[in-house]
Design a protein with these regions (language model features):
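Hydrophobic alpha-helical segments at protein termini of multi-pass membrane proteins
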Residues: 5-7, 11-399
């Protein structure tokens, strides 16, 4: 099919771009919206069920308000991390909704089955069973349930969205944030009174708002390294290692809570906080690397006439991008601003596809993706043509 257009089936660099034929938009899967509706309705049903069965309705409402406030803060951090190559909003929403519905439902059902299979409840067996359920079974089940979304992201066209470590961290974090949001509502709502609910909220929302996102991040890191491998065994190794790290971290967190305040605070200060600081450092470094990838790919794009030198000047800076979109919107209205945004996104996606090829991961699927991204970029340029023409003399702000 490629040969009929005069292109070789495999290419080495941007020199193949001029023969890619007429532009056409990248295909969009139409199952996303119905799936989002289904998962969203499931989340809503879970919330309604929590309210109807709550022992403390006032505490549940309080939990909803406080958990939502904490969740907004967590999401804001991940959206900041996702600025250089913003992920499709529909997939971000699906990640959060999966965490707050599908993962929660799977965890509840499986943990109930495990709990019912434990031996009879003598005084000693009760304590042992509780520890096994909370510190062993729950981490194993919940991290697997949350991780299913990341495994789904590794399939089909969704794989093209996992370009960098940042992408894996963002999807893992949003899935964990969704799970934590609903779990926090339930735990806070189970307090015997408002004071009890506030105490639980303090422990969960002040000390551990990033707990579940952090656990799932371990698997997200495993997914990223698995995607960098060629062999199946290597991929499986990194996936299992990431999953084991998520389970271990989750188990230590849950187990320490059962062993008294001293143990809990010790694990929190000596184990959780250093790991959290390490992940934050890793995330910021990955975000910085995204900027460098785009900057490195803009130069060849200029050489091959895909972008102009002026465009390359503002495409490599987040503040300059925002200002360019704002200028386009001011001069040409919302349509012009949206068109320039799409052009920016197309350039970024092409840069990441090209980066993977340059790092030696070029195969038929990736070259086909590059073909699609070039065509999408050409279509976006045509749509944004008048706005880009008006930006022809634009220079990014200095500093």
């Amino acid at each position: 099919r490629r040969a009929s257009r005069g292109c070789a089936p495999q290419v080495s660099h941007f020199t193949a771009f001029p023969c890619l034929g007429p532009p056409y938009p990248a295909p969009v899967r139409k199952v996303g919206a119905p799936l989002a509706v289904i998962i969203g309705l499931g989340t809503l049903a879970a919330l309604i069920l929590s309210l109807l069965t709550a022992v403390n309705p006032a505490g549940t409402l309080l939990g909803f308000a406080l958990a939502t406030a904490a969740m907004v803060l967590v999401l804001a951090c991940y959206l900041w991390l996702d600025r250089w190559e913003p992920e499709p909003p529909r997939l971000l929403v699906l990640a959060f909704l999966w965490g707050s519905s599908g993962a929660v439902l799977i965890s509840i059902v499986v943990e109930m089955l495990i709990d019912s299979s434990l031996p009879g409840r003598t005084a000693g067996a009760e304590a042992t069973g509780s520890f096994v359920t909370v510190a062993v079974a729950a981490p194993i089940v919940e991290e697997a349930a949350k991780g299913l979304f990341l495994l789904l992201m590794m399939t089909g066209r969704r794989r093209a969205e996992l370009n960098t470590l940042t992408d894996c961290l963002v999807y893992a974090g949003l899935t964990g944030a969704g799970f934590a949001w609903l779990e926090n509502i339930v735990y806070i709502g189970n307090g015997e009174g408002v004071s009890s609910s506030l105490a639980v909220a303090g422990l969960r929302l002040i000390l551990g708002p990033f707990a579940h996102p952090l656990f799932t991040t371990m698997f997200g890191i495993g997914v990223y390294f698995a995607l960098q491998q060629r062999g199946l065994l290597a991929k499986v190794f990194f996936l299992l290692t990431g999953y084991a790290a998520a389970v271990l971290l989750h188990g230590l967190w849950n187990g320490s809570a059962l062993m008294g305040a001293g143990t809990y605070l010790g694990v929190y200060v000596l184990w959780m906080m250093p790991i959290f600081a390490l992940i934050v450092t890793l995330a910021v470094a990955s975000r910085r690397r995204e900027r460098h990838i785009i900057a490195a790919q803009l130069a060849p794009m200029v050489t091959h006439g895909l972008v102009t030198p002026v465009e390359a000047g503002w495409l490599g800076s987040l503040p300059a991008r925002r200002q360019a979109v704002a200028l386009a919107k001011r001069d040409g209205g919302r349509v012009a601003g949206t068109a320039v945004k799409r052009f920016v996104q197309a350039v970024v996606e092409l840069a990441y596809a090209r980066d993977r090829i340059d790092r030696g991961f070029g195969d038929a699927r990736l070259f086909a993706l590059q073909h699609d991204e070039v065509a999408r970029m050409a279509a976006a340029r045509m749509e944004a043509g008048p706005a880009l023409y008006r930006l022809g003399g634009y220079r990014p702000p200095s500093g």
